[in-house]
């Protein structure tokens, strides 16, 4: 996250870190005791999930590590289009209990409204061009913009991709490299998943692109309920 500050250690209990043998890959969001939501483009062969983390150097006593037991990507996702249905649901290999730094964030009860203030967070780069990893997650507040605000900067993002456009039009605050998969929280509701953006991060007229969680509520709830053949909206 560029243009932000260190997150309050108690305000991201649902934020998880996804890492593999090469190191930190992505963030994700705990949505109940055994399921995490992230971006499909965060998938890799050997990743693990760390819950309850804040600082990379000073570990929280209640940090937990889980492996993915099952991973679900929309069966109707166009695989050659990385921005299409950029959402992945992960079942953990064992449940996690709520603790001081671990608690889920529920799915949105209504779609987000343009103009709402949204919270972004992650362990991604805090500088826009070269990648600078912070020791702690950084947080910032941005605005949910009309889809038309992202159209000029991102002609490749098609309307059927079910995305949200969020940022600051004049630039300066944005998610950045390695923030992928983390949450966009608007008016307290989990509305987006960090998917795509410009490089360098935080450019004017190039807000961030987020997967619209609300459109996938039915698919997510079906998978969790055991209907593993459920498909996503077109």
From Swiss-Prot:
Q: Which domain of life is it from?
A: Eukaryota
**Reported tissue expression:** Expressed by the venom gland.
What UniProt keywords are attached to this protein's entry?
Answer: Blood coagulation cascade activating toxin, Disulfide bond, Hemostasis impairing toxin, Hydrolase, Protease, Secreted, Serine protease, Toxin
Q: Name one Pfam family in it.
A: Trypsin
**GO biological process terms on file:** proteolysis
PTM summary: Not glycosylated.
Location of this chain's protein in the cell: Secreted
| Record GO terms (molecular function) | serine-type endopeptidase activity; toxin activity
Transmembrane segments annotated in the record for this chain: none
Which cysteine residues pair off into disulfide bonds? Answer: 7-139, 26-42, 74-232, 118-186, 150-165, 176-201
Spell out the catalytic residues: 41 (charge relay system), 86 (charge relay system), 180 (charge relay system)
Q: What class of enzyme is it?
A: hydrolase
Ranges where the Peptidase S1 domain occurs: 1-225
* Oligomeric form and interacting partners: Monomer.
Q: PANTHER family, per this entry? A: KALLIKREIN-1 (PTHR24271:SF47), KALLIKREIN-RELATED (PTHR24271)
Q: Quote the function comment for this protein.
A: Thrombin-like snake venom serine protease that cleaves beta chain of fibrinogen (FGB), releasing fibrinopeptide B. Has a coagulant activity activating blood coagulation factors V (F5) and XIII (F13A1).
Question: What is the protein name stated in its UniProt record?
Answer: Thrombin-like enzyme contortrixobin
């Amino acid at each position: 996250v560029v243009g932000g500050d260190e997150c309050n250690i108690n305000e991201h209990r649902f934020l998880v870190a996804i890492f593999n043998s090469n190191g930190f890959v992505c963030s994700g969001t705990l949505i109940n005791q055994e399921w995490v939501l992230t971006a499909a483009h965060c998938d890799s062969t050997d990743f693990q999930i760390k819950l309850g983390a804040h600082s990379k150097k000073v570990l929280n006593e209640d940090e937990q590590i889980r492996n993915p037991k099952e991973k679900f990507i929309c069966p109707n996702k166009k695989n050659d289009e990385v921005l299409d249905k950029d959402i992945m649901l992960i079942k953990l290999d064992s449940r996690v209990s709520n603790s001081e730094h671990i608690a889920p964030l529920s799915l949105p009860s209504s779609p987000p409204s343009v103009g709402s203030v949204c919270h972004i967070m992650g362990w991604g780069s805090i500088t826009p061009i070269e990648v600078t990893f912070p020791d702690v997650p950084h947080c910032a507040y941005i605005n949910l913009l009309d889809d038309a605000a992202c159209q000029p900067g991102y002609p490749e993002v098609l309307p059927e991709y079910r995305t949200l456009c969020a940022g600051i039009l004049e630039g300066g605050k944005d998610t950045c490299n390695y923030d992928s998969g983390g949450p966009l929280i608007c008016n307290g509701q989990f509305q987006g998943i960090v998917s795509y953006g410009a490089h360098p991060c935080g450019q004017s007229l190039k807000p961030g692109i987020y997967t619209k969680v609300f459109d996938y509520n039915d698919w997510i709830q079906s998978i969790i309920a055991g209907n593993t053949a459920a498909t996503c909206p077109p």
